[in-house]
């Protein structure tokens, strides 16, 4: 399981593991303005869609925040959609994205594809009320901050322990705010990994609805 908070992230970016990646195709678009080369991410951005498909770290957080701010400047009254398929990541990066989501004027629809684990689960819950969604087979994982590997003098350990407790309380109050649950319930539920199906995430208050497949909707 990917931990939400790596103690090493207290001082900076959590280390990134090896990742394999499908090569995105590029394509040519013709318009009245001429010809331009594009790719799926550019096309999504033009439709005011942000896709978070990697771990939450300084690099991905900066990318997401930049897109949020640009889309707000282009049109603050149009919704922004954030698709999420992420194993989670660092606390500071999570809160940077979270604060930016709350800062911009546009409503933000969050949609879970695959998984929203750990930090990504908080971002999923932080979407605008009534606009937090997931596909039927998506899963959501919430848990407490990780504590392993802390070293140093006693005074350093006390400082790090206090910071981990502060982060845990902040995570609990943030989830409580967006789920409607008491922070004490969140603390109990995140004492161990809590894995939720899309339907269970709706019942828990992390999302508002489970999406139907578009094919099925069209057949009705």
UniProtKB/Swiss-Prot annotation:
UniProt organism field: Rhodococcus jostii (strain RHA1)
Location in or out of the cell: Cytoplasm
This protein's name: ATP-dependent Clp protease proteolytic subunit 1
Active site per UniProt: 118, 143
Major subcellular site: cytoplasm
HAMAP family, per the entry: ClpP (MF_00444)
Reactions listed under catalytic activity: Hydrolysis of proteins to small peptides in the presence of ATP and magnesium. alpha-casein is the usual test substrate. In the absence of ATP, only oligopeptides shorter than five residues are hydrolyzed (such as succinyl-Leu-Tyr-|-NHMec, and Leu-Tyr-Leu-|-Tyr-Trp, in which cleavage of the -Tyr-|-Leu- and -Tyr-|-Trp bonds also occurs)
GO biological process, alphabetically ordered: protein quality control for misfolded or incompletely synthesized proteins
UniProt enzyme class: hydrolase
Transit peptide listed as a keyword: no
UniProt xrefs under PROSITE patterns: CLP_PROTEASE_HIS, CLP_PROTEASE_SER
Role of this protein: Cleaves peptides in various proteins in a process that requires ATP hydrolysis. Has a chymotrypsin-like activity. Plays a major role in the degradation of misfolded proteins.
Self-association and partners: Fourteen ClpP subunits assemble into 2 heptameric rings which stack back to back to give a disk-like structure with a central cavity, resembling the structure of eukaryotic proteasomes.
């Amino acid at each position: 399981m990917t931990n939400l908070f790596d103690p090493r992230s207290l001082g900076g970016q959590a280390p990134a593991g090896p990742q394999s990646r499908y090569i995105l195709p590029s394509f040519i678009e013709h318009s009245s303005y001429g010809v331009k080369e594009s790719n799926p991410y550019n096309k999504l951005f033009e439709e005011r869609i942000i896709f978070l498909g990697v771990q939450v770290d300084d690099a991905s957080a900066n990318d997401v925040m930049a897109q949020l701010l640009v889309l707000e400047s282009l049109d603050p009254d149009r919704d922004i959609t954030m698709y999420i398929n992420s194993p989670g990541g660092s606390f500071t990066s999570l809160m940077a994205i979270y604060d930016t989501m709350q800062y911009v004027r546009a409503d933000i629809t969050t949609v879970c594809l695959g998984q929203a684990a750990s930090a990504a689960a908080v971002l999923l819950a932080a979407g605008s009320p009534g606009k937090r969604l997931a596909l039927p087979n998506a899963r959501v994982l919430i848990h407490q901050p990780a504590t392993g590997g802390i070293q140093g003098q006693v005074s350093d350990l006390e400082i790090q322990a206090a910071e981990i407790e502060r982060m845990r309380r902040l995570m609990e109050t943030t989830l409580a705010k967006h789920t409607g649950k008491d922070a004490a319930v969140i603390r109990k539920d995140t004492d161990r990994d809590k894995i939720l199906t899309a339907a269970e995430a709706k019942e828990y208050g992390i999302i508002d609805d489970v999406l139907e497949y578009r094919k099925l909707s069209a057949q009705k």
